[in-house]
Amino acid sequence: MNRGAAAEALAASYLAARGLTIVQRNYRCRGGEIDLIARDREVLVFVEVRLRRNREFGTAAESITAAKRRRLRLAARHYLARLGREPPCRFDAVLLDALETKNIEWLRGVEGI
């Protein structure tokens, strides 16, 4: 398992332990991708997982660029169109500095995505 897949698996376990239900992993469409899609009660949650081993090129949060946010929004719209309805939604980010649960930061309702 590569580091990205390991980070996504760790994030999924972390969110599930906090009551979210993982609906889908690695949702892809032309031009977009979402790492995790989950349910938090009635809210559909689109989750971006970011792993940074060091901060030489910025933090995990800083690595969510404008282009990445556009791809997330595109994939979310595609997913909702396939779903055929639009439940309440939000975008979250799970940030990891290492592949350990003690180094996880969960940002709910990230603005700008």
Residue ranges with predicted function:
Residues R82-I113:
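Domain-level recognition of nuclease-like catalytic cores that cleave nucleotide substrates
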Residues R30-G32, E100:
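Short acidic/glycine-enriched loop/turn segments that link adjacent beta-strands
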Residues A61, A81-R82:
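Gly/Pro/Ser/Thr-rich low-complexity, intrinsically disordered segments predominantly at protein N-termini
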Residues A67:
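Aromatic- and charge-enriched substrate-recognition/interaction segments
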